[in-house]
Amino acid sequence: MFCLLCLCLTLGVWAFEPFRFAVVTDIHINVHAQTPSDDLRQTVAAINSDDSTDFVLVTGDIADAGDGASLRMAHDLLSKLNKPWYIIEGNHDQNWSESGCMDFLKIFGYERFTFEHKGIRFIGIPTGPMMRMAMGHVAPEDIDYVTSVLRSNGKGADAEPVFLVSHMPMQPADVDNWYELTDAIRPYPVVAFINGHYHRDLHFTYDGIPGIVNVTNLRQKGHSAGQYNLISLAADSIRVYTQAVGGTRHCWLTLPFTTHNDDDSTHWAPRPSYAVNDDYPQVTEQWTRDQGAAIFSSPVVWNKRVYAADNAGRVVCYDHEGQELWRHQTGARIIGTPAIGKGIIVVASADSCIYGLDAKSGQQRWCVRTGAPSVSAVTITDGTAYVGSGDHRFRAIRVSDGKVVWQADGIKGYVETRPLVIADKVVFGDWDNTLYCLDRRNGQRLWTWQPPNKDNMHYSPAGCWPVAADGCVFICDPERAMTAIDLNSGQQRWRTYQSKVRESIGLSQDGRRLYAKTMQDSIVCYAADGQAPRELWATDCGFGYEHARVMLVEKDGVVFASNKDGLIMALDGKTGRLLWKHKTGNTMINTVEPLSRNRIVFTNEAGKVGELGVRS
């Protein structure tokens, strides 16, 4: 009798006309590969021939390399659908975007969506990681968007049931702040999440809320076409089918249609632990500020002021106690770390401008327009700013007035790194498998270097900030190798896979030691020796699996590192002895800025800016 009553209540509250929609995900379009576009073309034709499908959700990983050409190809193919379709970004679209994800916005017209269909509401958001190798992350501005829509939708009997649409599943292993979203939506009538990412059909539960993970559109081995999913909604049930293009359809999941999800917190995923902070009570957060938008760049410190640039396109200036002094709004997100010289903060924006702002007042002094968005970090030396852009040009700009001193054309990929300026040379990597060395005086190309796996852009030497010592440039790249390259000739001196490093590197202040973060637990130190790789020490810091591309920085004999899980670590630079660890959150900490061995300024992906203090 009780079950019948519940069913009647469900039918009474959620009375709507049953309908069906399609989910197409992980299409991985590549302008250089025929099969993914063929698979999508056939899927579009199959959906068009099915009059019982009302609309289509396209749930991320649209372009395999996040490039504009592949996104445009995907748009052209999807535009042939004869029914409405709604799209969101996946990690491939956000992590390796030459435009800082501005191409996606320009081509598809939005980065998040909401719509109502036959009494059911759908909300779609991106889940990162944005321009960094890190965990998935729901940006604070996207959580605000979801909660704003849910508040408008209401909680009562007249509120529409809601489906949340995202590429990444809301699991601890996928999205570092999953709990912030599940906690935010819990009071509202959420039915389920609809996801992609895993390339196969899966049913998860995210803190008591069902998650429907859908199979990739890419064809399975031995098949000549791909597949997609169909989701049928009725007042009492959700049924999920996989439809092979030109083949059979099978139902692989049936769920009750309900918003009464599991509220027993003992069944939820464990929340992040901050117990490590109890082990090192000498470390405290002196001040923190929530900037209200994701931050993907390091803090900049100048004249007792702290500057942070964010995903909302703002540069915000704080005093040494964290009080905001000014903010300047650019036209699009800022990804790369700015730099300050001659009292001017130089920042590259995805609005296709490089700005020079007065570091005291925030007033714009000048702007250099580029032919495409820029996500590059900036280096300033002797009054000249060196910065890359998405228009395949690298520029040297006079800081005082914004005059372009020179520009180097023909940079094949986009530039993300902070350029290394050493003697008469400028060294930087791009996301087309190339490390460049230019003449600092005129931009003339002196040499280039490429990794062994030079045909796969995902192995590009582009994420790490190069360092130089002993006549060599040192880098770590995604092939899990550390490499020494002759600074004058560009010839490879040595390359080692010994420590399984990734894209994080640093140099001691005396130029004698290289620091790197491995992909499992350890910080390692090598001699800054151009003749052969020689490990000096390795310390197990216990941080687990790691792949965030954040650099290591030494100050006053202490080397500082950070990771994807919100941990900042300090080690003795000479011995590797672990001095302390402190967890500031559960998301990626950008490369930190130490003021001394006992004061460290940091930013994180959640939009937090702050300073740590260490008691001696």
Where are these regions (language model features)?
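Extended active-site neighborhood of metal-dependent phosphoesterases/phosphodiesterases
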Residues: 67-159, 180-192, 202-214, 223-234
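Binuclear metal-dependent phosphoesterase catalytic core
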Residues: 209-276
